[in-house]
UniProtKB/Swiss-Prot annotation:
Localization annotation: Cytoplasm
Residue numbers binding Mg(2+) 2: 417
Protein's name according to its UniProt entry: Lysine--tRNA ligase
PROSITE patterns membership: AA_TRNA_LIGASE_II
Record lineage: Bacteria, Pseudomonadati, Pseudomonadota, Gammaproteobacteria, Pseudomonadales
Reactions catalysed according to its record: tRNA(Lys) + L-lysine + ATP = L-lysyl-tRNA(Lys) + AMP + diphosphate
Source organism: Pseudomonas syringae pv. tomato (strain ATCC BAA-871 / DC3000)
Amino acid sequence: MSDQQLDPQALQQEENTLIALRKEKLAAGRAKGQAFPNDFRRDSYCNDLQKQYVDKTKEELAEAAIPVKVAGRIMLNRGSFMVIQDMTGRIQVYVNRKTLPEETLAEVKTWDLGDIIAAEGTLARSGKGDLYVEMTSVRLLTKSLRPLPDKHHGLTDTEQRYRQRYVDLIVNEDVRETFRVRSQVIAHIRSFLMQRDFLEVETPMLQTIPGGAAAKPFETHHNALDLEMFLRIAPELYLKRLVVGGFEKVFEINRNFRNEGVSTRHNPEFTMLEFYQAYADYEDNMDLTEELFRELAQLVLGSTDVPYGDKVFHFGEPFVRLSVFDSILKYNPELTAADLQDVDKARAIAKKAGAKVLGFEGLGKLQVMIFEELVEHKLEQPHFITQYPFEVSPLARRNDDNPNVTDRFELFIGGREIANAYSELNDAEDQAERFQAQVADKDAGDDEAMHYDADFVRALEYGMPPTAGEGIGIDRLVMLLTDSPSIRDVILFPHMRPQA
């Protein structure tokens, strides 16, 4: 590769020249009244034709003379034939000099990669066995003014791929497949829950009290109401209000917003599934989650073995179930139960592990800090980690046998949290006390502690049936199922720092 090819300024100058030439071609089309027509209706998709006629021989296709209308973007132009791409895949279209008018043949020569065309003709098969459309007519629908990335090197700069996802989708089939899978996963989750009598609902994105999770919210102002508001960090408290109101099985798939760090696992705007079912507990949700994950793996991969990087996660086997306390001891045999039950020793262990200890944390909070630093990243195969301390679970029901912990689990796969669930706290007085404790933590410097939500307490005072709820991160789940290393790979338009 020459130095000029590597020089960004030279590359930009070359692109500007190509854009100018394409604009001249568009101007010529406008002068003829042929720019951007919208009167073509296709009757076939490229890949559907490939599948439908895969067994038809060259002779059978010639005899059948099957008429088709296709449309797509030019991805290859060899003069005698072109390859076009639509949402399903690609097909060749043959430029037949015997059947196409001279004027059309002249126009075809001026078309560029990226242009969108409409073609009519009959199906045929080449000597090499490739299916193609022998065109009887073809015309330009959309002129592409910007050239596509170099065909040999493509769009490989990661940041540019995220910033210009539209180009990324045009040139990278694996990226298109990732987002097809994402759509498939969400559709199956919706069907899975509806088949079990769950009702899909929508709850507010703008909230006066950000609740339902320990996170820092985005703040905004409602001008008409002169009211400080927050983009929601979770829909939980509204969904549980609906359970109080009599909708005993509800779910929502929507966006949450958290004004926190960005990493390969975190995006400030992300998609979450939350569902709640009355007359169930967190163990019922574990069973339901295993069933859902197995179905999704089978749907996407045709197997319950999920390859991810150099690992394989086994969804077909029972997920490990282990308490926070026991998991610390299992994965850190140098620690003892006595260490974890002494607040001073636990604080020292948490600090040594790298946790941000502020000094006001109770024993349960310290145990979770130790878990996050010393255990979480070791949980490769699916693990349900249960019995979280009540200090870090202000919305979860206390365990009947040990009131210091709650009937809660988090699901970890590949060292990442994928789901969070619990038997819901439906004791209004206990909920009020826990909100007050959260307010005290916030006053002591915990930015992620929850606000006091008096209306939610009021709702519980009307009575909420025994209920289990769960949140599943859609983005992280899709990462697993598509072997994607970064959350940005599964979000169509991830947030990026503005370019200088």
